[in-house]
Design a protein with these regions (language model features):
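Alpha-helical segment of the N-proximal tetratricopeptide repeat
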Residues: 101-129, 214
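N-terminal accessory interaction module
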Residues: 5-78
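TPR-adjacent "capping" and linker segments in tetratricopeptide-repeat scaffold/adaptor proteins
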Residues: 56-61, 85-104, 164-166, 210-214
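Residue-level signature for tetratricopeptide repeat
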Residues: 109-110, 141-142, 164, 181
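Alpha-helical repeat scaffolds
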Residues: 86-89, 118-126, 152-166, 189-198
Length: 214
């Protein structure tokens, strides 16, 4: 049994938070000087894997590509929704011209590498930032992929499903994944109810859907 909440905390602890000179950083990114951050200080997260290879090279560390920080910020937002810097990160991401392309390519790269938990956290961060329903569908899909490999991810997937249902997100997918989880638990009656909700909300009827419904 794997405790995924602990695993997400552990992923968070692998981020290094580097203190930034706020004014210099704003100038670098092109953030106007009148724009203010919520926090007095600014620490940007970066995956330790990038640092360890450059640790003795101060010039390299000073000139780390913004790309690495984009990944760090999305992982931080995705792993800890209460992190005090999140509002500042979202503000920064708004000013980085390549944010959208960068996060999309990072997510598909992590999925190709089968680093699904990283992909999941990047998607969570991206959803928090964009509130894009297509991103939420991907969160559920990647969550289900992790759950198929390891059933102890179920509770996190169910939390995401509940979030979608409680907040009336205009997507049918939460009911499909709910049905799959219920069917796996042997609760066929509840699975059928969820599948009917899925169809009522405009979900596509595929072979899998028909199987749950019989």
């Amino acid at each position: 049994f794997m405790d995924y909440k602990a695993k997400i905390k552990e992923r968070m602890s692998k981020l290094l938070f580097l203190e930034m000179n706020k004014d210099g950083f704003k100038e670098n990114i092109g953030i106007p000087s009148y724009v203010t951050f919520k926090n007095k200080d600014l620490y940007l997260p970066i995956s330790s894997e990038y640092i360890s290879s450059n640790i003795n090279d101060e010039i390299k560390i000073k000139n780390l590509p913004i790309y690495y920080f984009i990944e760090g910020m999305f992982i931080a937002i995705g792993a800890d929704e209460n992190l005090r810097f999140n509002d500042d990160y979202e503000l920064i991401l708004d000013y980085i011209k390549d944010t959208e392309n960068c996060i999309k390519s990072l997510i598909s790269k992590r999925i190709q590498e089968e680093r699904y938990l990283d992909a999941y956290l990047l998607l969570k961060g991206y959803y928090s930032y964009s509130k894009d329903l297509e991103v939420m569908k991907k969160i559920l899909l990647v969550g289900e992929t992790i759950r198929e490999q390891d059933s102890s991810f179920k509770d996190i997937l169910l939390d995401d499903i509940e979030y979608c249902i409680t907040n009336n997100l205009k997507i049918a997918e939460p009911y499909l994944y709910k049905a799959i989880v219920l069917k796996n638990e042997g609760d066929f009656k509840a699975a059928r109810v969820a599948i009917n909700e899925y169809i009522n909300k405009g979900g596509k009827v595929t072979k899998e859907v028909e199987i749950i419904n019989t």
